[in-house]
């Protein structure tokens, strides 16, 4: 049921152009798109190319073409993070003026023996929190992490995180001058008026930091829903690094049917022989977030876990 008193729904899909879309990317796109359309809301598209060393030339255009081929329709023009550096700089300067960030001289080697944070990274020990050591220059700028962050994930349920002990002071401006993902995504979501974020559970560990930044910058906090991450038969997340096959080579209607099945929507077998248009129509009408499996990851069905250069012959 849609709450008429709630603000207009604005969702988004924000792929990184580090390679072509794979089945895991498709699942995230399908989940966010259907939740937006089922709420009669907007679905925005953002290309997260702020991390220029990871950006592959031509990948963004390939992503846009694949989404169009699969029948996705987004609202407004795609937003490119590389065109929004001034907005990130303004947000960073606000944090610095408020004393919420500090320069850090620590290298990865110096932090190698630190305790592990919740997401598997090294927990920052606070070495530079009260000033740089004599003779050292800043390699990055970090946010002073403090307090507990709690939120109700629409799929994964109640979440709580102590920033100081489970995350530590986190980077918002890197030594190479690149703004960190956490800052860029928060600024972009606020600028677009995003009310609901539906994405993979691999980003669940980033949510506490993003809510923290929203509080510091005076931004509203969207509702969050984290879908199970798609993994291959070895239990690895589908990605460029694990040689996930591009979905562009797959029949769109069959791939969409598989994504709906993965998301617990229980599409009828006859839909597997329907056209792409008919499949989308059924999916929007029957979308149910409560039926999405409440788990952090699940294996891709059959040939959809195939590696690049393998032939998905079962399709």
From Swiss-Prot:
The protein's UniProt keywords, in alphabetical order, are: Aminoacyl-tRNA synthetase, ATP-binding, Ligase, Metal-binding, Nucleotide-binding, Zinc
**Cofactor binding summary note:** Binds 1 zinc ion per subunit.
The positions annotated for binding Zn(2+) are 104, 106, 124, 128
Indicate which residues the UniProt annotation says bind ATP: 240
Record-listed L-glutamate binding positions: 12-16, 48, 181, 199
One of the Pfam families matching this protein, by short name = tRNA-synt_1c
User: Which intervals of this chain are the motif 'HIGH' region?
Assistant: 15-25
Gene3D superfamilies xref list:
HUPs (3.40.50.620)
Q: Where is the signal peptide?
A: none
Q: Which cofactors does the annotated protein need, by name?
A: Zn(2+)
Task: Give the enzyme class.
Answer: ligase
Name the EC number(s).
6.1.1.-
Q: Where is this motif: 'KMSKS' region?
A: 237-241
Functionally, this protein is described as follows:
Catalyzes the tRNA-independent activation of glutamate in presence of ATP and the subsequent transfer of glutamate onto a tRNA(Asp). Glutamate is transferred on the 2-amino-5-(4,5-dihydroxy-2-cyclopenten-1-yl) moiety of the queuosine in the wobble position of the QUC anticodon.
Write the protein's name.
Glutamyl-Q tRNA(Asp) synthetase
Q: What is the scientific name of the source organism?
A: Aromatoleum aromaticum (strain DSM 19018 / LMG 30748 / EbN1)
